[in-house]
Amino acid sequence: MIKKIGERKISFSGWSNGRSGSNDFREMYGSDACECISSNDQYTFVFSQVRTLDLIELEQLLQSVGWSRRPIRRVKKALDNSLLKVGVWQHDPKFPRLIGFARCTGDEVIQATIWDVAIHPVYQGFGLGKELMSYVLRSLKDKGIERVVLFADPGVISFYQSQGWTLEPKGNRCAFWYAN
């Protein structure tokens, strides 16, 4: 069970590469793990592209933010075919909890599209979404990606605008087809 972590904002003291390179930490989260530690050292969140996402835990996270349920085999296939997958865990040496997630597709050269971004509702409003987006954009830039497109529900557009994203100006340059 995820506990409420308080009403105040967490200010982050910065990024590190995980417990000074501790082998246990690396085994738990993967070689690319980065910590984001609250300024009062009370909370540690770990961002990783390498740690395997538990599909049941991911499904629970996505349901917590109101996304519709999809068959696990389709979710696994989507993850397998993604350019970038990032998990965010609240660090606990015995039972780390997945509390955030982002997924991107792309051509691996010029353009990427961010399709999925989720932070568990208990952790929203603490700055973790901003940190996750910053991590994703840095990771895409490190891959040489020049342009990033983001699809977002209307209810979260203001969040992305506050992070410097701009809406597509003409509103008619994109079309969708949905299978029944």
From Swiss-Prot:
Keyword field contains Isomerase: no
Keywords, alphabetical: Acyltransferase, Transferase
CDD domains: NAT_SF
Cellular component per GO, a single term: cytoplasm
Top enzyme class: transferase
Alphabetized Gene3D superfamilies for the sequence: 3.40.630.30
A Pfam family the protein falls into: Acetyltransf_1
EC number(s) stated in the UniProt entry for this protein: 2.3.1.-
InterPro entries (alphabetical): Acyl_CoA_acyltransferase (IPR016181), GNAT_dom (IPR000182), NSI-like (IPR045039)
Limits of the N-acetyltransferase domain: 45-180
Keyword tRNA-binding: no
Family: Belongs to the acetyltransferase family. Ycf52 subfamily.
Protein name as annotated: Uncharacterized N-acetyltransferase ycf52-like
Protein source organism: Prochlorococcus marinus (strain SARG / CCMP1375 / SS120)
